[in-house]
């Protein structure tokens, strides 16, 4: 039996997920009211016109996931349709701050979304 490691998964990057030729992405972060860093990825249509306002959608992830998974796919597809989208790692998950890791605290999560609106 041969055992191997998928390098992209082992390194924690998202090279194995869907990418669009019509969307630019940028890794960003901001702080919530608890001074915790919230990690996120901004998705912008490549045809974005400077100075024009665009509709925006903030995309969270399901429990047990991170922004690179389904939230990133939804954010990409919405950006292909002309939306500015922001996929975030909720506090205690992924690249966001918070201990203990993987905690479920909906009151903090709601503040993450509020801070995401302020960021946009």
Task: Annotate each predicted stretch with a short phrase.
Residues 55, 73, 115:
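Short Gly/charged-rich anion-binding patches and loops
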Residues 9-52:
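N-terminal cap/lid segment of alpha/beta-hydrolase-fold proteins
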Residues 1-10:
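N-terminal membrane-anchoring alpha-helices
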Residues 67-70, 93-120:
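Catalytic nucleophile-loop/oxyanion-hole region of alpha/beta-hydrolase
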């Amino acid at each position: 039996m041969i055992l191997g490691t998928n390098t992209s998964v082992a390194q924690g990057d998202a090279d194995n997920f869907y990418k669009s030729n019509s969307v630019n992405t940028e890794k960003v972060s901001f702080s919530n009211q608890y001074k915790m860093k919230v990690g996120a990825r901004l998705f912008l249509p490549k045809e974005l016109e400077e100075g024009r306002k665009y509709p925006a959608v903030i995309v969270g992830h399901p429990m047990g996931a991170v922004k690179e998974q389904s939230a990133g796919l939804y954010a990409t597809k919405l950006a292909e349709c002309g939306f500015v989208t922001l996929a975030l790692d909720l506090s205690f998950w992924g690249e966001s701050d918070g201990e203990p890791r993987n905690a479920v605290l909906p009151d903090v999560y709601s503040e993450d979304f509020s801070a995401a609106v302020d960021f946009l």
